Structures are given as C-alpha cells and as structure tokens.
Regions:
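Active-site acidic short loop of glycosyltransferases
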Residues: 81-83, 113, 160
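N-terminal targeting or signal-anchor segments and their processing/structural boundaries
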Residues: 1, 73, 84-91, 95, ...
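Thiol/disulfide oxidoreductase modules built on the thioredoxin-like
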Residues: 139, 148-189
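Structural microenvironment flanking redox-active thiols in thiol-disulfide oxidoreductases
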Residues: 99-137, 150-155
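Oxidative protein folding and maturation machinery
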Residues: 1-73
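Short active-site neighborhood of thiol/selenol oxidoreductases, capturing the structured segment around
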Residues: 75-104, 117-119
Length: 190
C-alpha cells in the first residue's frame, strides 16, 4: 500500500506538472481510495488532492469570490462580464511568473476588456516588492493581493500549490483551459 500511495501521488503530481488534464480527470473519477490506502493521514491528503482535481477540472465552474484590488476597487469574479477571464496566480519571487506577467501585455487591451479580462492574484507577502514590480511595467488589468502568500483566502479557495497557475474561464466562469505556458494560453485564445 505504501508503494501504491507513493506511485499514485507521483503520477498525479507529474500529470499536473505537464498539464495532462484528461489523465488526471480519469484517475480522479476512477480511483477508489477506500480499497487502496492504509495510512489515514496519507489517504486524507490524496482524497483532498483528488477532490481538488475534480473541482477544478476543465468544464467545471470556479468558485466565486469578492475582494478589493490594489487600487481599492471592489471586485467580484462573477460580475466580470468579459467573454473570457484569465485568472492567474503568480508572485514576484517566482521567475516563471515574472517572465509570464509581462507577456500577458501582448494579449490584453483595456479597451477590449469585454473580450478578455485578466485577474492577477499575487501570492506576495511584501507590498513593496509587488508594487515595485507592477510599477516597472504596464499591467492595467485587475491586480489582487492580500499579502498572505499561500495562506491567502483566494489562493486556498482555488487550492493553488504552484505558481504560475492559470485558469482561462468562459463568461459563465467555467474552466475552458488550464494553460501551463503563455504559448498554450495564446493557442486557446486565438
């Protein structure tokens, strides 16, 4: 059973890393943890991971949230009326993120936010670091941060475990795609 648990955890982690959503969905739909795991703590961790995979699968509606953005404006995800919404979890201390965020300027036009709106949820703890990074570029989309890193309400609500994490949403806030890279995002949009 210990080897089974390790292999299952390893495979799920690997499939998540490479964006094999269909394989992950298949595992989540067909695994019966009651028959396989002995260690109750490990079983609880795997059950949580499997439930999260099911909850955030392509085609599922994401949970709604309301918060205040960095400009002090109230934001409610369900009230964003664009055709697509990109929800991106990132941080200034993540090198992949600091490469991705500037690339998003290529696809975002404030005057066309009815087509695509970006909601960037930062996991930063330092307001100075975040504002310093944002002030270096042109990032006119919705920027959110509660400065609680992995313990932030929205971060926990979405079971974020890595940065960057992206969800491309339809206007009804169902998941269209979970791109891993900017090129995958562009392929979904264009």
């Amino acid at each position: 059973p210990l080897v089974y648990e390790y292999v299952l955890d390893y495979l799920i982690g690997g499939f998540e890393t490479y964006g094999f959503d269909k394989v992950i969905t298949y595992i989540a739909d067909n695994i019966n943890l009651d028959e396989t795991c002995v260690n109750s703590e490990r079983k609880a961790d795997l059950e949580k991971k499997v439930e999260s995979l099911k909850k955030f699968a392509v085609g599922k509606k994401v949970p709604d949230f309301s918060t205040t953005d960095l400009n002090g404006d109230k934001i409610t995800l369900s009230e964003i009326k664009s055709q697509y919404t990109l929800l991106v979890f990132w941080a200034t201390w993540c090198p992949h993120c600091t490469n991705l965020i500037p690339e998003l300027q290529e696809i975002y036009f404030p005057e066309s936010s009815d087509k695509l709106e970006i909601v960037a949820v930062s996991l930063d703890e330092s307001e100075d670091d975040l504002r310093g990074f944002l002030n270096e570029g042109r990032y006119p989309w919705i920027n959110i941060c509660d400065f609680k890193k992995w313990k932030g309400q929205i971060v926990q609500q979405f079971d974020v475990y890595a940065t960057p994490t992206m969800y491309l949403l339809f206007n009804d806030k169902t998941i269209l795609a979970k791109p891993m890279t900017f090129s995958e995002l562009k392929n979904e949009l264009f």
